[in-house]
Amino acid sequence: MALTLFSRRATARSLGSCTTIRAFSTPVNDTFPPSPSAPPPPPEASHVLRNAVSAQGTRYNWTRDEIRDIYNTPLMELAFQSATLHRRFHRPSAIQMCTLMNIKTGGCSEDCSYCAQSSRYNTGLTATKMSSVDSVLEAARIAKSNGSTRFCMGAAWRDMRGRKTSLKNVKSMIEGVRAMDLEVCVTLGMIDQAQAEDLAQAGLTAYNHNLDTSREHYPSVISTRTYDERLQTLSHVRQAGINVCSGGILGLGETPEDHVGLIHTVSTLPQHPESFPVNALVPIKGTPLGDKLPEGKRPIPFDAILRTIATARLTMPATIIRIAAGRTTMSEAEQILCFSAGANAVFTGEKMLTTEAVGWDTDKAMFEKYGLVPMKSFERGELRDMKGKLEASSWRDVKDAAEQDGKAVGLEL
């Protein structure tokens, strides 16, 4: 017996620590990996993030440090918290379909380093005169028949000085589009207070004038128009009672700190913009930025787009966040993540100014596949009665609650 025990011990030593000796059996080579450690606890949300998620209204005194703190939250936590807030202010499955038409192409005197419509760059684009009122209204009718509830018009020039005839035609376009019960937005460069008042009288819903990027990075992108001139145009628009549409372009060679700076600027305006477009650079050969980017390389990683959308939602809870240029590079799954995190509008149709757009049929198929519905005209974000609904045990519970809310205000989910 002693000899047998000694033999077993010797055998165990010879086989090493990786071998298991079973009583009354031959040794077997069972290798046991180290016991897995307990998963790390989920990151604790900062007090800034907690306060943002529990917001009862809009806030205009964000500090840059606070926005940076939100932006740098671990991405899964950031997207979850922005989705939670989004459902308190918006119908989660309602996405606005917008169509953008170029009513005057090319020939712009500015040097925006991303833009094909600048006369300074050789991009192969042919400048055109302004489209006729009738052709624009026909395009708006087609957009409406395909489900768009917002029709946007863009003209490539620096400002409206000396353009009395053009302004008159634009006002006729605005009046005609509004008669179709569509929201109408224009982007016409810089405008003064009198021009803003004229557009307001014509029934303009919103005026788009993007800030593009942070104040710090802006001089690297544009030299012919200052950041303060852009802010001045937004001030004229607000004072005229027109909704402000202002966002940025990601992929201009900026850093995450510039995303923070852009959001800080728009979220501390006297009023939050009615809508915040998030563009991803579409590189166009012949432009300075288009020539810098290697062929086939994505100008901005998707996680930066998602972080920007989520941070914008948490700091501007009632604002419509629009996925604009560059959506053709996103998969359906990426778009759905954006919608979940707080984006609730897309540009759809044949073209988006000079770049390709996701077509109406493609978007309709995506909406049907994922249970999305077109947002109604003039639907806006506001704090909704979600008492007890955020604690729902499943997505079905959340959707049922939102559907009841939609019926209560005469909307379809």
Language-model-detected regions and their locations in the chain:
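Auxiliary Fe-S-binding modules of radical SAM enzymes
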Residues: A2-T20, F24, V28-L75, A79-F80, ...
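Functionally engaged cysteine thiol sites
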Residues: C18, C108, C112, C152, ...
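N-terminal pre-triad scaffold of radical SAM enzymes
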Residues: N72, E77-N122, T128-G154
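Mobile, glycine- and charge-enriched loop segments
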Residues: S93-M101, S109, S113-N122, K171-R178, ...
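Hydrophobic faces of well-ordered beta-strands that scaffold small-molecule active sites
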Residues: I95-M101, F151-M153, V184-V186, Y207-H209, ...
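Conserved short loop/turn motifs at secondary-structure junctions
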Residues: L100-I103, R158, V186-L188, L250-L252, ...
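Short glycine/proline- and charge-enriched loop/turn segments
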Residues: A116-S118, E216, G290-E295
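Conserved Radical SAM active-site core
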Residues: S119-G247, G251-T268
